[in-house]
């Protein structure tokens, strides 16, 4: 059974690129437009979440905290995919429960390498 990954980004083009790349590698992908949408779609088995940081309604940090507050998803990998690369933002993400960080722009190969490493 394919691993299921949720990609969360307010940019449709980023969501589509992430989804296309991961589907090509055999993963099932759920798309969400922001943190609030992601929490509403977080049902059943999700093996990993890839989220932007800066989004309307509920940002990536708020989403991570919301996911980590649910026992069923307390330990799933969550990777931030964002233009933010400052140490303070990374520390804030890590404190909230982020597993890893990919800085935009990124290549599909970088994304796949991180996903495979995290889902081992």
Predicted regions: what is each one?
Residues 55:
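Receiver (REC) domain active-site loop signature in two-component systems and cognate sites
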Residues 16-24:
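Charged docking surfaces used in two-component/phosphorelay signaling
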């Amino acid at each position: 059974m394919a691993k299921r990954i949720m990609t969360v980004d307010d940019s449709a083009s980023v969501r589509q690129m992430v989804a296309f790349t991961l589907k090509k590698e055999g993963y099932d992908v759920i798309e969400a437009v922001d943190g609030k949408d992601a929490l509403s779609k977080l049902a059943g088995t999700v093996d990993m979440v890839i989220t932007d940081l800066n989004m309307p309604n509920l940002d990536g940090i708020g989403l991570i905290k919301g996911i980590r507050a649910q026992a069923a998803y307390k330990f799933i990998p969550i990777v931030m995919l964002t233009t933010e690369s400052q140490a303070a933002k990374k520390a804030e993400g890590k404190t909230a429960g982020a597993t890893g960080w990919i800085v935009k722009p990124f290549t599909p190969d970088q994304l796949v390498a991180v996903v495979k490493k995290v889902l081992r």
